[in-house]
Design a protein with these regions (language model features):
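Helical mechanochemical/support elements of P-loop NTPase systems and associated helical scaffolds
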Residues: 2, 41, 56, 82, ...
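Extended interfacial segments that mediate partner engagement and assembly in macromolecular machines
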Residues: 49-128
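Arginine/glycine-rich "motif VI" loop of SF2 helicases in the C-terminal RecA-like domain
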Residues: 111, 136-145, 163
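Helix-rich interaction surfaces within compact, conserved domain-sized segments
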Residues: 149-203
Length: 216
């Protein structure tokens, strides 16, 4: 078996599209998100659906050619690890000055093209999200970057990572730290099934006349 072939789909993929698993000393399956744990590994497509299928169909034992113990909530365990990694990197980006929060500052970062990605708390009101989305569309219309937006965490978790309270909207700014955050948010979003592809939405509206009005 190719060492970068998903044990569920049997298809090869880039490592960023896969999650590596190894067997620990206690014969338990362990997710290796950093791909640096010793021992033989197997690979699963990097989304919850395929991880759950691998566990349910006993595919880990088949891949490792020995009986292994699969944690009952392996899918949830991987989700938690990805979320913790994303929030930890977000906190580091804040310390590096690469995050702003608050609707006004976020909108300004979008319109200036400084924002790399947007984070909305799960509790974010539709009106606040809509205003920032208008700014994103207008930025694309004027030839600026298409900025992705994610709604992956509740306000309490965003606030804890960013050292603030009532953090509903945040912008991660273009920088090395911002790129590291983006990589982890993309991985978490993919694992959870992916957000609606608003990049396509942004491209579709880029030529609309009313997009220019959003800038005003």
């Amino acid at each position: 078996m190719n060492d970068r072939t998903c044990i569920v789909t049997r298809k090869t993929a880039e490592t960023d599209e896969l999650i590596r698993f190894v067997v620990g000393p206690d014969s338990a399956v362990v997710p290796d998100l950093k791909r640096n744990l010793p021992g033989r590994g197997c690979w699963v497509s990097a989304d919850r659906l395929h991880v759950d299928k691998a566990a349910a169909k006993n595919l880990f034992s088949r891949a490792f050619k020995t009986k292994v113990d699969v944690p009952a909530e392996l899918g949830a365990l991987v989700d938690g690890l990805l979320a913790r990694s994303a929030l930890g990197m977000l906190g580091l980006a804040r310390k590096a000055g690469a995050v702003v929060f608050g609707a006004t500052k976020v909108e300004a970062a979008v319109r200036s093209g400084e924002a790399l990605l947007i984070l909305h708390a799960e509790e974010a009101a539709e009106d606040g999200v809509r205003k920032i989305s208008q700014a994103r569309r207008a930025t694309v219309h004027l030839g600026g970057p298409a900025i992705r937006a994610y709604k992956l965490f509740p306000e309490a978790e965003l606030g804890l990572a960013l050292g603030g309270t009532n953090v509903i909207h945040a912008a991660v700014l273009a920088s090395d730290a911002g790129t590291a955050v983006q990589k982890r948010m993309v991985a978490l979003d993919r694992y959870r099934g992916g957000s609606p592809d608003d990049l396509a939405m942004l491209a579709a509206v880029a030529g609309e006349d009313d997009a220019a009005e959003d800038w005003e």
